[in-house]
A protein has these predicted regions:
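Non-catalytic, mostly N-terminal accessory regions of nucleic-acid modification and defense proteins
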Residues: 1-206, 210-211, 215, 273-282, ...
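Alpha-helix initiation/capping motif
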Residues: 3, 145-148, 167-171, 196, ...
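A conserved structural/catalytic subdomain of Rossmann-like adenosyl-cofactor enzymes
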Residues: 5, 285, 289-516
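Conserved, well-folded catalytic cores of nucleic-acid-processing
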Residues: 20, 162, 181, 185, ...
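Conserved NTP-handling cores and scaffolds of large molecular machines
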Residues: 25, 41, 47, 182, ...
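Hydrophobic alpha-helical packing residues
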Residues: 90-94, 261, 400
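Conserved S-adenosyl-L-methionine
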Residues: 193-299, 304-315, 320-325, 335-336, ...
Length: 516
């Protein structure tokens, strides 16, 4: 079986399990149990592989807890960020799950122990609260303890039955792929709410490539509204690990999604010392402001997010927003995320941000912010995407690419709204579409009906309108008429009509003659 076939088979199996174990509970409400259990299995097997160190004679899960010395535990936590005793390993808990009458409390105790093992270590904040949404007492699992344990046992057995093979690098990828697949399907079924925490994989790939284009190495990559971390991890998938020197950084407002993002990092084999995901409102309580600026920023922020705006007089003096001289509209904070990203960008950096199209042509504060961005030569490219690419919205969104190292004062506009493949419920961006966009993004060449590099003066004269349709002429798909051929066809038709008229006259004359 090829790796592609293996992935496809695994995805079918895991989605079937996810639907089977949830029973009558909505999949969106049950996701943390399936995702959390997958994560529990991953960190157990990852930890066992580390302890065993390639010695096939050692089976960590078969050891007794009493053989673990304080030195072994201390060293493991410093390296892996957490500790799991043999008795707490996923395989052991899953094996006795069906007959364990205290399964729900045992799981809660194990998760608490894993989290607390990091207390006092550098990994404490990366591990703390990871299992907070895995509520073993929730009525979503059932009304009685027996019902709860039965549902939990079903989830454990289902995840235990997934065939990831031996725990090596290729199968580590399978864990990450399975997790991303689950998140993607949950997001697709959740509609709008799902779109707020997951960016479709192909769009993520395009955004990551735009942000890191031309870079032989970057210090770190950042997403100010990171959701489940899918955008950040696309950078890891697209580029060798050594290119991203100091790792992955992000901030997320939603507590459940924040935990999903941290789990996602571990599941993609990003060690605790190579990521920093923080919880909180990026616009009001930003993290990383005192850190070294980022060489790459990617983001798909929530659309039309509400900003405190005029209600918070301190924001206009905030170093992120003050240079523009105006705040983003209170009910549409899209440009607040753009200005935030710009302020965190290094002098060699590039940011690629998903934006709703309205911010590129509306007046008022948004027009003033566009003027600030264009006058200071920060806008490298605006790309319009096809409609219905994202979960939760059918609108065709755009990608705004900001740069602090442009070599000219032109702004590039790319109309990629026609690049998509129609699928059952959504449109999809293909690899060939991404290559087409990246090719013209790199060359900055003008392509009729697709891409145009526009001088600063032209954008300024157009009231700083950044709508692609203002600069890239849409292709006229109406049929081109050949006038000469049309005239020839008309002449032939007229001749034929005249002949038919003569034939009819002759027939009529013949009939009238017979009647006489």
């Amino acid at each position: 079986m090829t790796s592609t076939q293996q992935r496809a088979a695994l995805q079918r199996q895991i989605w079937a399990i996810a639907n089977d174990v949830r029973g009558a509970v909505d999949g969106w409400d049950f996701k943390q149990y399936v995702l959390g259990t997958l994560f529990y299995r991953f960190i157990s097997e990852n930890f066992a592989t580390y302890i065993e160190g390639g010695d096939e004679s050692v089976k960590y899960a078969e050891l007794t807890d009493s053989v673990i010395t304080p030195e072994v535990k201390d060293d493991a936590i410093k390296t892996k960020g957490y500790f799991i005793y043999p008795s707490q390993m996923f395989a052991n808990v899953a094996a006795r799950a069906s007959t364990n009458e205290s399964l729900n409390t045992d799981l809660a105790a194990i998760f608490a122990a894993i989290e607390s093992s990091a207390n006092g270590y550098p990994s404490e904040q990366d591990i703390k609260g990871l299992f907070a949404d895995f509520d073993t007492t929730s009525n979503r699992l059932g009304n009685t303890v027996k019902d709860k344990n039965g549902r939990l046992a079903s989830v454990l057995r289902g995840v235990a039955g997934l065939d990831f093979g031996d725990f090596n690098d290729s199968h580590i990828d399978l864990f990450g792929d399975a997790y991303e697949f689950l998140i993607s399907n949950y997001a697709a079924n959740a509609g709008k709410s799902g779109g707020e925490f997951f960016t479709p994989q192909q769009v993520s790939k395009l955004i990551a490539r735009l942000a890191m284009h031309g870079q032989s190495s970057i210090n770190k990559i950042y997403d100010p509204a990171c959701g489940s971390g899918s955008l950040l991890l696309q950078a890891k998938k697209q580029f060798d690990a050594h290119i991203i020197e100091d790792g992955f950084f992000g901030q997320e407002l939603n507590h459940t999604t924040y935990n999903l993002a941290r789990m996602n990092m571990f599941l993609h084999n990003v060690n605790y010392d190579k990521f920093n995901i923080e919880l909180g409102d990026t616009l009001i309580e930003p993290h990383f402001g005192d850190d070294k600026p980022f060489d790459a920023i990617v983001s798909n922020p929530p659309y039309s997010f509400k900003l405190a705006g005029s209600d918070d007089p301190t924001l206009i003096n905030d170093d992120r927003f003050a240079p523009a001289g105006v705040l983003a509209p209170k009910s549409k904070a899209d440009f607040a995320f753009v200005l935030h990203a710009l302020s965190y960008l290094s002098s060699k950096g590039r940011a690629a941000i998903v934006c709703f199209p309205g911010i590129f042509y509306r007046g008022g504060a948004e027009q003033k912010i566009r003027r600030y961005l264009v006058d200071n030569n920060y806008v490298e490219t605006v790309i319009s995407l096809a409609p219905n690419l994202f979960f939760g919205t059918t609108i065709g969104v755009s990608i705004l690419v900001l740069s602090k190292h442009k070599t000219d004062t032109n702004t590039q506009f790319i109309d990629a709204s026609g690049l998509f493949k129609k699928e059952t419920n959504n449109n999809a961006l293909l690899d060939s579409h991404i290559e087409q966009i990246m090719q013209v993004f790199e060359s900055k060449e003008n392509v009729d009906h697709f891409a145009q590099s526009v001088p600063f003066e032209q954008v300024a004269a157009n009231d700083y309108n950044l709508s692609i349709s203002s600069y890239v002429e849409a292709k006229d798909n109406r049929e081109v008429l050949d006038i000469a051929q049309l005239n020839a066809d008309l002449k032939t038709t007229v001749t034929r009509i005249d002949q038919l008229r003569r034939d009819i006259d002759a027939i009529v004359a013949e009939i009238e003659g017979e009647e006489l």
